[in-house]
Amino acid sequence: KEILYLFVFVFLIVPVMIESLFYDYALKILGNSLYAGVLMGLIMAVIFTFVVYLFCIKRYKLSWKDIGIRKLSWKDLLWTFVAVISLIVVSIGVLMIMEKLGISFENSKTETIQNDKSIYAFCIAVIGAAVISPIYEEILYRGVFYTFFRDRYGIWGGMLISSIIFTIVHIPTYNTLPVNFLSGVVFAWLYEKTNSILSAMIAHALFNFIAVLLTFMSN
């Protein structure tokens, strides 16, 4: 029942109430789509984290440790960096194949970043992509959704379903969906390997940081 509530928040309430209504208002005030997007990310982070706390932690008297926030060992950190490097290599391969097929990986997000290459804009983009998003997305998609589906359909079933959900929420940036799916699988695998979503958060943050950096460096 609680998972159903989360699905309603993720796929209905948040897209309609936050992204559709508040984004336009924020864009009008800030006058910059990058800043408005990061602000929306922060608002969604607070909402999603609160919903997870309300429906999962408080309701069942759990702790944040129960959804995967546990200390990492040096070995866990090593696995994290190996996973990030592997994900980057595979993602580059996927993007090269897409380019050969005539599918551009440029989208509204990359265009927004490339339109303003100031240090200030870079820092704002990094905060949104490499700080805010990894924290709340890993809590929700790996800490809650992956754990829920893993307990019912096994490790690979949990990875597949949670990664599909993670991919769907990145629509309408359709040309990056293959990479979104791959990253979802890798982050879920890391969580399973290290028994901590902190590893997934770090990997997610590093991957997004590199993506933002490369976007700023591109012509």
Regions found by a protein language model. Name each.
Residues 27-38, 62-133:
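Juxtamembrane helix-loop-helix connectors linking adjacent transmembrane helices
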